[in-house]
């Protein structure tokens, strides 16, 4: 009976193990998870903090006991894989509760250890990061126990923006700082102005080109010379792959610690796969490498690896499109395709429209800004971005499908919109992009 070992029990690992069991009722499957919880919804965590998700239990899909009862898959939490011997096909596991170590053999090994939050490294009892449900509980308990009011949020990526919004909606008083003037880097820089407008509208303080110089209790000294007091600090300064334990093996890592994989999510070592935040692949629509540490990619990779292990060796990954979206107060920011800083590798043109998300005469209309970049050599779409109070998600998903099928910008004129006044226009914004590009 084949033995399958999975490292990591969140989006990628737990999903992959579950899909393998659906296809293969006999294999022995065991998952090692170094932290307390398995199968929690990472994307729900800011909303748990903001009490939008009313009970944290809704962010936790399974416990190890429930997972075993439903799927006959063993999950060992607080068990950290600390080394891989790919020649003997074993992993070394540390029981973090007892500090005991043991070896576990495998026939197939699936690596889905995820990533960890970066930290600025200050010694501080009021500083937190947000990466898992344990972090969420710690933040929530600290807020309640210390009657937290003023919170400093560091960083201006998706997670920091979501955390800030949820702290504000909870009734706290957040302040945002960011070390540069380039916020929300997945979006075009000039499309991010509504973020600052939303902060101004609510009189939420923010400072760009600002960093912490020192923390002394609740007193924060900044590089600008300002000294302010905060009850709590939440750092959102990026992540790094949990790949340190892989260095003991023959598995290839890139310079940032990610694992390059092929279209079957195989590593360079036989019988070892990598999925989720730790794996790097390529774009679907252009010939460039891509790392997209988001939920869709982890789930898609999990399904492909499960099919492979179950015997379907014809299924392959066709690449990422990098579709992403975030809500920040009243606005939605969405984009798909290559990142803004990757456009320079192409000879491209840009076309954009700004008009109401639905028919102008229908109540509640608001402007939607839609932008598309296309390759001048073949007129295929390289990237699209949308910002507005409604309709951004719909347009970006349509453009994602267009890019998936390598449509040209001109073919957007042929998109047949589901039109009614509350939803769109007879000639939708997507159609108008195509007409303007001609």
Swiss-Prot record:
Keywords: FAD, Flavoprotein, NADP, Oxidoreductase, Redox-active center. NADP(+) binds at residues 151-166. The keyword Coiled coil does not apply. FAD binds at residues 8-33, 267-277, 419. SUPFAM superfamilies: FAD/NAD(P)-binding domain, FAD/NAD-linked reductases, dimerisation (C-terminal) domain. It catalyses: NADP(+) + 2 CoA = CoA-disulfide + NADPH + H(+). Its cofactor is FAD. Binds 1 FAD per subunit. Homodimer. Contains 2 FAD binding domains and a single NADPH binding domain. This is Coenzyme A disulfide reductase. It comes from Staphylococcus aureus (strain N315). The lineage of its organism: Bacteria, Bacillati, Bacillota, Bacilli, Bacillales. The gene is cdr.
């Amino acid at each position: 009976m084949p033995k399958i070992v999975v490292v990591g029990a969140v989006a990628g690992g737990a999903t992959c193990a579950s899909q393998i069991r659906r296809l293969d009722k006999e294999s022995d499957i065991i998952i090692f998870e170094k932290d307390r919880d398995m199968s929690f919804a990472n994307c729900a965590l800011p909303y748990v903090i903001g009490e939008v998700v009313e009970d944290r239990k809704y962010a936790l899909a399974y416990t190890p006991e429930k997972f075993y009862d439903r799927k006959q898959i063993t999950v060992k939490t607080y068990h950290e894989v600390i080394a891989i011997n790919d020649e003997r096909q074993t992993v070394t596991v540390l029981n973090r509760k007892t500090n005991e170590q043991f070896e576990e053999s495998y026939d197939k090994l699936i690596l889905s250890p995820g990533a960890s939050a970066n930290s600025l490294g200050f010694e501080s009892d009021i500083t937190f990061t947000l990466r898992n449900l344990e972090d969420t509980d710690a933040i929530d308990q600290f807020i309640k126990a210390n009657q937290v009011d003023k919170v400093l949020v560091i960083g201006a990526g998706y997670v920091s923006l979501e955390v800030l919004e949820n702290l504000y909606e909870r009734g706290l008083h957040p302040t945002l700082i960011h070390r540069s003037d380039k916020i929300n880097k997945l979006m075009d820089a000039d499309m991010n102005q509504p973020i600052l407008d939303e902060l101004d509208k609510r009189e939420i303080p923010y400072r760009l080109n600002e960093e912490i110089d020192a923390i002394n209790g609740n007193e924060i000294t900044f590089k600008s010379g300002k000294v302010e007091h905060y009850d709590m600090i939440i750092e959102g300064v990026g992540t790094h792959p949990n790949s340190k334990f892989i260095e003991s093996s023959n598995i290839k890592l890139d310079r940032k610690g990610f694992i390059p994989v092929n279209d079957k999510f195989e590593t360079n070592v036989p019988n070892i796969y990598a999925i989720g935040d730790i794996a790097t692949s390529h774009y679907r629509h252009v010939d460039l490498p891509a790392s997209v540490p988001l939920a869709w990619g982890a789930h898609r990779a999990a399904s492909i690896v499960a099919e492979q292990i179950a015997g379907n060796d014809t299924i392959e990954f066709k690449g990422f499109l990098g579709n992403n979206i975030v809500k920040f107060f009243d606005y939605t920011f969405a984009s798909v395709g290559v990142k803004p800083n990757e456009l320079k590798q192409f000879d491209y043109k840009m076309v954009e429209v700004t008009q109401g998300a639905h028919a102008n005469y229908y109540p509640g209309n608001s402007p939607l800004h839609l932008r598309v970049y296309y390759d001048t050599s073949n007129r295929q779409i390289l990237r699209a971005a949308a910002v507005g109070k409604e309709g951004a998600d719909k347009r970006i998903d349509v453009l994602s499908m267009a890019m998936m099928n390598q449509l040209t910008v001109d073919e957007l004129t042929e998109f047949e919109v589901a039109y009614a006044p509350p939803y769109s226009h007879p000639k939708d914004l997507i159609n108008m992009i195509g007409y303007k590009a001609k």
